Amino acid sequence: MSLLTEVETPIRNGWECKCSDSSDPLVIAASIIGILHLILWILDHLFFKCIYRRLKYGLKRGPSTEGVPESMREEYRQEQQSAVDVDDSHFVNIELE
């Protein structure tokens, strides 16, 4: 008697996936979450430089000038421009009073 006659071979029906026909809400939710995770992962890897640069530098803004007259805004811009002098590749910060 050989070993091949004693081993049961699985029939094709035993290998089929039963998830494809399932309307179980848990399976549907897991599929949606998996697809969204994949999309976000791809977008993150494609655009991470833009996204993190925007988060790092985009949130650092100057003080709000809402309600300030235009003449005072222009004066403030000029003071900010003259506050940093470039001298032989050195930056000098001048505090305004």
UniProtKB/Swiss-Prot annotation:
<keyword id="KW-1083">Inhibition of host autophagy by virus</keyword>
<comment type="function">
    <text>Forms a proton-selective ion channel that is necessary for the efficient release of the viral genome during virus entry. After attaching to the cell surface, the virion enters the cell by endocytosis. Acidification of the endosome triggers M2 ion channel activity.</text>
</comment>
<dbReference type="InterPro" id="IPR002089">
    <property type="entry name" value="Flu_M2"/>
</dbReference>
<feature type="site" description="Essential for channel activity, possibly by being protonated during channel activation, and by forming the channel gate and the selective filter">
    <location>
        <position position="37"/>
    </location>
</feature>
<dbReference type="GO" id="GO:0016020">
    <property type="term" value="C:membrane"/>
</dbReference>
<keyword id="KW-0449">Lipoprotein</keyword>
<comment type="subunit">
    <text>Homotetramer; composed of two disulfide-linked dimers held together by non-covalent interactions. May interact with matrix protein 1.</text>
</comment>
<dbReference type="GO" id="GO:0140321">
    <property type="term" value="P:symbiont-mediated suppression of host autophagy"/>
</dbReference>
<keyword id="KW-1182">Viral ion channel</keyword>
<keyword id="KW-0946">Virion</keyword>
<keyword id="KW-0407">Ion channel</keyword>
<keyword id="KW-0406">Ion transport</keyword>
<protein>
    <recommendedName>
        <fullName>Matrix protein 2</fullName>
    </recommendedName>
</protein>
<feature type="modified residue" description="Phosphoserine; by host">
    <location>
        <position position="82"/>
    </location>
</feature>
<keyword id="KW-0735">Signal-anchor</keyword>
<keyword id="KW-0812">Transmembrane</keyword>
<keyword id="KW-1043">Host membrane</keyword>
<keyword id="KW-1032">Host cell membrane</keyword>
<feature type="topological domain" description="Intravirion">
    <location>
        <begin position="44"/>
        <end position="97"/>
    </location>
</feature>
<dbReference type="Pfam" id="PF00599">
    <property type="entry name" value="Flu_M2"/>
</dbReference>
<comment type="similarity">
    <text>Belongs to the influenza viruses matrix protein M2 family.</text>
</comment>
<feature type="topological domain" description="Virion surface">
    <location>
        <begin position="1"/>
        <end position="22"/>
    </location>
</feature>
<keyword id="KW-1133">Transmembrane helix</keyword>
<keyword id="KW-0472">Membrane</keyword>
<dbReference type="GO" id="GO:0020002">
    <property type="term" value="C:host cell plasma membrane"/>
</dbReference>
<feature type="lipid moiety-binding region" description="S-palmitoyl cysteine; by host">
    <location>
        <position position="50"/>
    </location>
</feature>
<keyword id="KW-0564">Palmitate</keyword>
<dbReference type="GO" id="GO:0055036">
    <property type="term" value="C:virion membrane"/>
</dbReference>
<feature type="modified residue" description="Phosphoserine; by host">
    <location>
        <position position="64"/>
    </location>
</feature>
<keyword id="KW-0945">Host-virus interaction</keyword>
<dbReference type="GO" id="GO:0051259">
    <property type="term" value="P:protein complex oligomerization"/>
</dbReference>
<feature type="transmembrane region" description="Helical; Signal-anchor for type III membrane protein">
    <location>
        <begin position="23"/>
        <end position="43"/>
    </location>
</feature>
<keyword id="KW-0375">Hydrogen ion transport</keyword>
<feature type="site" description="Seems to be involved in pH gating">
    <location>
        <position position="41"/>
    </location>
</feature>
<feature type="region of interest" description="Disordered">
    <location>
        <begin position="60"/>
        <end position="84"/>
    </location>
</feature>
<keyword id="KW-0813">Transport</keyword>
<keyword id="KW-1015">Disulfide bond</keyword>
<dbReference type="GO" id="GO:0044694">
    <property type="term" value="P:symbiont genome entry into host cell via pore formation in plasma membrane"/>
</dbReference>
<dbReference type="GO" id="GO:0005216">
    <property type="term" value="F:monoatomic ion channel activity"/>
</dbReference>
<keyword id="KW-0597">Phosphoprotein</keyword>
<dbReference type="GO" id="GO:0015078">
    <property type="term" value="F:proton transmembrane transporter activity"/>
</dbReference>
